[in-house]
Amino acid sequence: GYIRRANYYVAKGKDDQSYFDKAVADFNQALKVAAKKDDVYYNIAKLIYGYQLSKPETTYKDWTYDTALKNLRQAMAIDPLPVYTQLEGDILFAQQDYAGALAAYEKVNASNLASAASFFSAAKTKELLKADAKEVLALMDSCIARCPQPVTANFAPYLLERAQIYMNNDQARNAMLDYDAYYKAVNGQVNDLFYYYREQAALKARQYQRALDDIVKAVELSPKDLTYRAEHAVVNLRVGRYEESMKILNEILKDEPKYGEAYR
């Protein structure tokens, strides 16, 4: 009850800092009476971490990531549960200690708490550590393997993440497959940007008809976007439709005479 009330006070504290004092009093009371002190330390850490993530204009007393970490490590000293290690990774990640965060996520991934989210966290951290793309992709594969199969809408963003990594590493055909799987997962509820990204993958994979279909869709959904219209001209050029390409470029220049891309 104390922890729940402390959470309520912290939410109220955004407008009135005196509520933070009440939250601290509840923390202290919870630590006195709780049988599972590790659970209280963990909840204090989680609360302070969440508070810092919200980027407060002025930090209340010592409610920093370091304080969150100190409380969390007191919880871990009592019982090193994987859920505590996951939060340790998240706090270290927020502090930009990516090596420390990765070590924590790797422990979670070797535990019974391993999930799509924990493998994704490890993949993003490795990426920030400039690790080999093969290692990052292996973690993304593990992430997607832990999603429901076929992937559902809630887990679909992981497919977009992997597609982007494939594109950055010249694996356009694989990226296209992930974009297709994403499209299926969200029942075709996609926007112009999705069609533009998938078109880029199709173009790199030399699937020109597919690239053309997708860029047409992007232009349909956002007819004023000059990037899409210029790309439409480029794809027409690639498939040898020179007149169509020139027509599109002339239309762009008519609407926006200063648009430099159209002169390429």
Question: Where are the predicted features?
Answer:
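TPR-repeat structural position
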Residues: F20, Y65, Y98, D132-A133, ...
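Register position in tetratricopeptide repeats
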Residues: A11, G50-Y51, A94, L128-L129, ...
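Canonical positions in the second alpha-helix
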Residues: Q29-A30, Q74-A75, K107-V108, C143, ...
